[in-house]
Amino acid sequence: MGSAADLKYSKEVERAAYEVGRLIAEEDGILFFGAEKDSDSLSTAACRGAKDAGGLTVGITYGKGKDIWEKDADIIIPCGLERGGGRETVLVTGCDAVIAISGGSGTLTELAIAYQADIPMVALAGYGGWADKLADEYLDTRNRILTIGAASPEEAVKKAFAAAAEYRRRYA
């Protein structure tokens, strides 16, 4: 989960997203990402990292049709829904854990959906956006799930895999 290109993120944060994708693939994880139709994003950078490491990628896109920005995704699922909650719900509920990097309103929506669905969230801090604001915080006073903070792509992936394993034990 991460910023779309219109938020003008830095090359540094793009490299971090790429690294997260690469590390997920190296751990034999499947990368689900928000497949954009009209621009690059941190999610597509993660897709490129996963693909370069030989991983499996699943792009969830809005609307109809499979024409997306990142042409190398293995599986593209057009959910028939639009941005702003519908596509994000399909994307997040397909995951055993989510990793947020930077992020604007779309990332915040995805984190709120994960929180409500009891899906573990890891926030890679140090790159701004909602990930920085929510690292090691709860989304509200109910304190359902702590957003797990991480300081590096390696730590984020390690923590996400550990949290995902616990999630699968609880909900298998």
Predicted regions and their residues:
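Short, glycine/acidic-enriched capping/hinge loops at junctions between secondary-structure elements
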Residues: 9-14, 44-45
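Short, glycine/serine-rich, charged loops/turns that create anion-binding
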Residues: 4-5, 38, 64, 128
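Acidic/glycine-enriched connector segments
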Residues: 18, 26-28, 33-112
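Short, amphipathic alpha-helical "lid/cap" segments that border enzyme active or binding sites
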Residues: 18-21, 153-158
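C-terminal binding/interaction regions
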Residues: 2, 9, 80, 85-156
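Generic N-terminal amphipathic, Lys/Arg-enriched alpha-helix
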Residues: 1-11, 23-30
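Short, hydrophobic alpha-helical segments
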Residues: 160-171
